[in-house]
Design a protein with these regions (language model features):
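RNA-binding basic/glycine-rich loop and surface signature characteristic of RAMP-family CRISPR effectors
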Residues: 1-125, 129-221
């Protein structure tokens, strides 16, 4: 039976996060590197592709036996969940990760914030000439929250728990890494909370859903 599981939760930003958007039409005096925003609301967003790519990169470091120059060279377990365009071995991704829009705008504004982002001034110094190169980086503020929404297609019950454990491992590793750019300078530390899975298409036994949620609950432990 065609079955899909929805995994929901919250991504909480613990340190200022920068996922870059376009500055092609920035006015004079505007920030050098703006964050990506939803065009309708103007709220900061996390593209699903950014989260999926980061998850896969971390899993590749942990699970691949050697350095993979291309995603198609990832181990079979990763390709099974995230997909592969390898010639002769094409695999459809089992997960769909939706774009995530800032969800706690009212809470942030009630804390006295006039803006949903902050601008951090940074500087690089040329060691040879001592010439400074200042720049302005826009960041999503600490305390921002984004609603996580992932759909997982059940293709093989025999590896269902193994696939969910892979996703949970990616969440765990990301909490000790960073999302977006400039992680080495303290940007982009995040936390996953309120993870919950339910069947939205087809049917699974309650015991199966309970086991999936047990696996996901270990992410925040």
């Amino acid at each position: 039976m065609y079955t899909k599981i929805q995994i929901t939760g919250t991504i909480e930003v613990l340190t200022g996060m920068h996922i870059g958007g376009s500055s092609a039409f920035a006015a004079i005096g505007a920030v050098d590197s703006p964050v990506i925003k939803d065009v309708i609301t103007g709220y900061p967003m996390i593209p699903g592709s950014s989260l999926k790519g980061k998850m896969r990169t971390l899993l590749a470091k942990a699970y691949n036996e050697s350095v993979a120059n291309k995603p198609d060279q990832d181990c079979e377990r990763i390709k099974r969940v995230f997909g592969s365009a390898e010639k002769g071995n094409v695999k459809k991704s089992r997960i769909q990760i939706s774009d995530m829009i800032l969800s706690n705008t009212d809470e942030l504004r009630n804390k006295g914030l006039n803006s949903l982002t902050e601008v951090k001034f940074e500087n690089t110094i040329n060691r040879a000439t001592a010439v400074a190169n200042p720049r302005q980086i826009e960041r999503v503020v600490r305390g921002s929250e984004f609603d996580l929404d992932i759909l997982y297609e059940v293709d093989n019950m025999d590896v269902l728990y193994e696939d969910i454990e892979l996703i949970a491992d990616a969440f765990k590793m990301l909490q000790f890494d960073y999302l977006g750019g400039s992680g080495s300078r303290g940007y982009g530390k995040v936390k996953f909370t309120d993870l919950y899975a339910k069947t939205v298409i087809g049917q699974l036994d309650k015991s199966v859903e309970d086991k999936i949620n047990e696996i996901l609950s270990k992410v925040s432990q």
